[in-house]
Amino acid sequence: MKIIVGLGNPGIKYAGSRHNTGFSVVTGISDKFDIPFKKKECKAVTGHGMIAGEKVVLAMPQTYMNLSGEAVQELLHFYKCETADLIIIYDDIDLDVGRIRIRKQGSAGGHNGIKSIIGCIGTDEFDRIKVGVGHKPADWDLADYVLSRFPKEELPVMRETVENAVNACEEIIRSGADMAMNKYN
């Protein structure tokens, strides 16, 4: 079983923001594989289904970003899964809009959701898909930037990027992170 967690903030106020790109990707996975979000459990909204012959749980934590680790820890415990069964999908301001990067481990890199997950589960060794949301302009506050929405001219690129991230997640499940990194990084 794989637990696929898209990071974001709950509530309509944050829908479509750069920081909710993880939610956009797991919603794309839900749509592509017909896995509806039906349950509220472990501080997350979840959907259960199959991808490439593997049981999966899709999850969108309903904590705020900086508490995402609580939901991830509860999901791992509830489903008796290891961190090797985890795929985390989130926004990255160090990647250009349109880029994705797959990693098998690494630091939080300033991302509070990843920092929370590493703190709660006690390791940075888990598969992740970082989705580029662009670099913060010098005159912007970081929080304002990540909570902003994409301008119209970036929306087509982001739709394609979300689709690439969905396909990358499928590749991780089907062939492993190394193969997915070779194909998508």
Located regions from the model:
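Nucleotide and nucleotide-moiety/phosphate-recognizing core
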Residues: K2-Q105, K115, G119-I129, K136-D141, ...
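Hydrophobic alpha-helical segments within soluble ligand-binding/sensing domains
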Residues: G110-G113
